[in-house]
Amino acid sequence: MVFGKNIGDETICVVGLGYVGLPTAMAFHSVGFRVIGVDVSDRVVNKLNDGESPLIDSSSVIEIPVGSNRWSVTSDFEKSVPESDVVLITVPTPVNPDNSPNLEYVKSAARSVLENVDRNRRTAVVLESTVYPGVTRKVLGELCESMGLNNEIVTLAYCPERVNPGDFERGIESVSQIVGCDDQVVGSQLARLFAKITNESSTYVGKMEVAEASKLIENVQRDIDIALAN
């Protein structure tokens, strides 16, 4: 693999341990990866380290792997990011009062990640949060440029989260994955990486904007289906 390891040997860092990030982190752990979960909330970190789920109505179906030597949870970006081969950003993207997208969580998480990458190795930074086409390149790409992080240090990608928050019975393994990345080699490797956690397809689709647009179209289709049903 381009990160210097065989697929399956990577350390995966998941930033944002909510309804998307926590199941994603646990899915990678369950298939053998070393996983570092990062969250800025002390409540979330403390609950997970005590073996409790911070998610409402999930305790009966989510078992936190406390005690596993492949699982750790922290709020410390400085220690966790440099140890990781792949960093997944799974933070919320709410809307502002005027219905414009609020990207502050994405910007804050991306900045904390990029400030702490190991410049002596390549790290794949994958945004999973729901965004409009162009955000990964504009927000994360411009941060990389301002910090002097070229593609040999940080390779950006987008893989839209497609789980249904709160649906703990139909998990991430039931959802197909798509990956957009300007680097075809890394994008293809990331698609194979995500294939480890799903029973459905995992496909490299080319540019990041293609993957971003696919999530937007999926959401529009869902809204149309709901409107027609009503």
What spans do the regions from the language model cover?
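Conserved N-terminal Rossmann-fold NAD(P) cofactor-binding segment
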Residues: 2-10, 34, 40-86, 93-100, ...
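Glycine-rich Rossmann-fold phosphate-binding loop(s) that bind the pyrophosphate
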Residues: 17-18
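N-terminal Rossmann-fold NAD(P) dinucleotide-binding loop
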Residues: 21-22
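Gly/Ala-rich phosphate-binding loop of Rossmann-like dinucleotide-binding domains
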Residues: 25, 29-30
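Glycine-rich, N-terminal phosphate-binding loop of Rossmann-like dinucleotide-binding domains
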Residues: 89-92, 129, 182
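Rossmann-like NAD(P)(H) cofactor-binding subdomain of soluble oxidoreductases
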Residues: 95-162
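Internal alpha-helical scaffold of NAD(P)-dependent oxidoreductase catalytic cores
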Residues: 142-158, 163-230
